[in-house]
Amino acid sequence: MKQIINTKFVKNILFSTLALFSAVSLVAQEEEEAPKFTLSGSIDAYYRANLNAGNGVDAQAPGSSFANLPGFALGMANVIAGYEGEKVGFVADLVFGPRGTDAIFASPMYSATGDIVNQLYAYWNVSDAVTLTFGNFNTFLGYEVISPVANFNYSTSYLFSYGPFSHTGLKADFAISDDFSLMLAVMNPTDLTEFNPVGQYAYGVQLGYSGQYANLLIDNGSYEIDFTGGFDLSDSFFLGLNAAYFNGDEEDGIGSFAGVAVYPQLATSENFTLGLRGEYFTETDFFGAIGASDAEGDASVFAVTLTGSATIGNLMIKPELRLDSTSEDTTFVNGNGEPIGSLSSFLLAAIYSF
C-alpha cells in the first residue's frame, strides 16, 4: 500500500526543529557574550623575627618593602571586583592593612579613602589585537608585584621596592603576533595615583617576546630600564630573572641604582615548592635604599631568601629564611647595640586566596 505523507505535518516538525536549534544557539550566544562580574582577592598575615638583632621596639628589618613588622603582624586584605564584557570592562582593586598602605604610600592626596585604592581602571578591547586601559594600574616593570599571592617569596626584593608600584594614566597594549607584544603608556609621575599636582608626565614602553619583557620608564628627568622573564627548565624546575638600572635626575639630587635577581624554584610535589631569591643591589649618590653608605653615597647589598611554599586548598603556608649582607658594617645593630653589616631573619606567612 502506498504510504501517504502529510506534508503539513512534516513542515511543522521541520519548523519546530529549526526554531528549537535557533533558540538554543541564541541562548548559547547570549551566555557566551553576557558580561561577567567577578570577585576575588586574598588575606595574609605573618610572624617575623630577627635572628642576630633585637626584636623589641627598635626592631630592624631589611630596606625592602613589606613584611617588615616584628612579631605576629598583618599583611593586608585584598578585594578585587571586576566586570568583563565582550569589549569593555573594569577592575576595582581595594586593599586594607599595612601591606596595602605601604604599597600606595603616596595616597591619599585628595580623597579621604585614597589609601585603599590599589587599582581602579576601565578597559576597552578595541580589537583582538588592541586593548586600551584608562585609570590606575599596577606597574609593568619588575618581576614581583604587590599581592603576595602572585609572588613566590613573601618578603620582597630591593629591585621591586625601589621601582614604581603603580601608575595612573592611559596605556595601549598591542598583540603584534602570537609571540610579540607591545605596550605604550602616558601617565602621571610615578606613584601619584589620585591626580597630577605637578603638570608633568611619565612615559612607558614594554616589548614582550614569549614571556620575556624589556621595559622602559621615563619620568621627569629620571629613567629606569628593566628586564623581567623566566624559563621552565623542566616540568618541576623554573628559573625567574629580573635586572634593572635606574638613573635618577641629578638636578633633583636623586641617586641611581642597579641590580639583578634570580629566582630558582623546584616543585618537590604537587603541594610543595622550594624557592630561592638571590639578589645583588647597588646604589650611588645617597639613593637611600640600603641604609648606610660610604662617604660618596655608594652602597651595595647581597640578599638571599630561601622560601618554602606549602599549598592546602586555597591556603598557602610560607616559611622563609633571609640574609641581607651589606657593604657597610654600620647598616644594622645587633642585640648588644653594636653595629653590624648583615641581618638574618625568619618569617612564617599564611596567605588565603579566593
Go through each PLM region and give its residues.
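Surface-exposed extracellular loop regions of Gram-negative outer-membrane beta-barrel proteins
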Residues: 78-99, 175, 181, 228, ...
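Residue-level detector of the transmembrane beta-barrel scaffold of outer-membrane proteins
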Residues: 38-42, 89-91, 131-133, 181-183, ...
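Short N-terminal segments immediately surrounding and downstream of signal-peptide cleavage
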Residues: 30-45
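Outer-membrane beta-barrel channels and translocator barrels
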Residues: 34, 84-88, 127-129, 177-179, ...
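Outer-membrane beta-barrel pore domains
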Residues: 63-66, 100-103, 108-113, 212-216, ...
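Residues on the lipid-exposed face of transmembrane beta-strands in outer-membrane beta-barrel proteins
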Residues: 41, 45, 70, 74, ...
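Surface-exposed coil loops of outer-membrane beta-barrel proteins
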Residues: 46-71, 100-119, 127-208, 214-216, ...
